[in-house]
Every structure is written in structure tokens, then in C-alpha cells.
Amino acid sequence: MKERDLLIFLNAINFSSENSLKVLDYLIDKNLPLEDFYKLDFLEEKILTERSANRLDERAGDFDLIIEKISEKINSIGVHIVTILDEDYPDELRYIEDPPSVLYVRGNLKIYNPIAFVGARSHSSYGNMAVNKIIDDLRFYDFTIVSGMAYGIDTLSHRRALLNNLNTIAVLGTGIDVIYPKSNKALYEEISEKGAVISEFPPGTQANKFTFPMRNRIISGLSKTVVVVEAKDKSGSLITARLAAEQGREVFAVPGNITSIYSVGTNKLIRDGAIPLVEIKDILDFYPGILSKKDNEEKIDLDLEEMAVYNLIEKGINNTNDICINLNNEVFYINKILTKLELKGIIEKISMNEFQILK
């Protein structure tokens, strides 16, 4: 038996990460064979509560079957598992107070300059504009936008990141195979293709009042900074802000109109010590060296649509049809943008439908 298989099994029977790691650490500390986990009285040893110990006793005999079913399930949906024991487990998460023992991953879990965006599920037009403005300004740098793919600010943040060809990671409050809300199915697929969707919950887990607060610690834990865009007085995003502060992350809040219910939470965060996010420099100051990564001055004159096309060509997606597919737009519209970029001397045509960057 492998240590990671034990963690996957415990996760599958709904053990918390804390209890899963307690069980594994006890076996390792006592130099006991992993295969004997079911023979131990974890209740007597005060490792587990009676409820958890009973669940372990009841399900221990299903170990092989559960591991087999999990393996079949994730293979069928293009998901892989990363445990806290693995080298490719995110370092950002490894050292938080309650790290997830298991992560189900759909996509490529690459993380650089991670920044979380959280906020109200119902939001104002100001919140929409704030997300667009901030993420548009981040497009000149290699940021990873982390959020929760819920209604509202989460969805806006992921979509704007994708539009700007920024890496994005969605942390679910459900199992990796449960899309919530269902209306975000297309977004789920696009994030999986161009970034990553992750969950600590076993496949099939439905949304409930406990899963979303639990996933908030992962959103903040993955990130170096957290931006709260809009929040009512009792908003769940304030939980993420609190967790971020406890994890030593910097918390930004977008200042809002004092008469708006959607800005009560963010304004109070600022009053209590969060950094008011007024301009993009406020964020960049917390990512030393990012300005030296690449000189993007020549891109500044491009509008958002031109930038989206430019970024694709720069990545090697230089065929007109492929650009249309990636940006989900019609050929005639993309051709107009390509022509504008040609006239600006930024790209050139190298074949009937292919282009390359000139500068």
C-alpha cells in the first residue's frame, strides 16, 4: 500500500484533511505497516473521534474497491490526483494551517504570481467594471487569477482572465465532476483547457453550506494576494479575507460607494487594515521582479481585442481558424483585428491564414 493511496481512500470516505494526515502521521511515527491501518484503535489513541473511528472501521474492508472506483472515475473524466506527498503539490498550499491532503485536478496546475479575486455573488455594475479594469491592467504581466467559479465576481474574474489570456484556476466547492452553477459548464470546460479546475472533495460531492467555506482557505492559500471586489456586510468573501490574513497573505479591497450595500464589506475591510486597491501599482508592489519579466511597452497601444489576438499569435496559435476557436468569434471579426495589427506593423502574414509577430 502506498501512502498516497491511503490519503485518497480517507478522502473518499469523507475524512477531513486534518484527520487523514493524523492517521498517516500516526502510522509513520509508530513505524507501523500502512496495511494495518484498520487494526488500530484510533479512538483509544485519541487520534480520531468516535464518529470518525467508526466510519473508518465500517469502510476499511472496501479499501481496494474504493481506490479502483476512484481511479476509474478520474480516468474517465480526464482528472488526475495530486496529494500533499507529491512533488507537484502547490508549495503555496503546503504550509497553510489546514492544507488539503488531496486535490483532484482537471487541467494544468501551473501557478505563477497567483492573485485571488473574490466578491459578491450578486454585484453591482461598479463591481463588474472594477473586475474588468483590474484584470485588464494585469494582462501585461504573468499573473494567475484564482477564484471559485461561483456566480458573480468569481465568474466575471475567470472570464476576464481568459479573455486576456491569463492563467486561471477555479477552486470548486463541489466534487471535481460537479459543475456548480450548471450555467458555468462552458466556463468549466474552458478553464480546464486553458488553466485548471481543482477540488479537495471526492467526485460526486454536491454543494452544501459547509463545502464553500472550506474551499475558501484553498483560494486564499494558493494566492499571494487576495482582492475583495465587492462584499455585503455578511458576505462569504469576508471569510476568505479573514483566512487570507491568517495565512499571511496581503488583502486588497476595492473602495466603494458608502451608500451601496455591495461595498459595506469592502469599505469595512479597508477601515480594519486591508489595502485600498486604487491602481494596478498597488498590486505590483507585492510581486517583486515582475516588471523585469518582459518589456511590454509596445503592447500598451493595443485595445483589449487586439491584445487577445496578439497574445495567441505570440503563443504559437497563429492560424486564423484556431484564433477564432480560442476567442469564440467569427472569422470576419477576427480578420478585421488581424488587419489592424498588420497595419500597425505588429504582425505579418506568412501564409494564407497564418501570422507571426514582428515586434
How does the language model describe each region?
Residues 1-2, 81-359:
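Glycine-biased, small-residue-rich flexible motifs in mid-sequence functional cores and linkers
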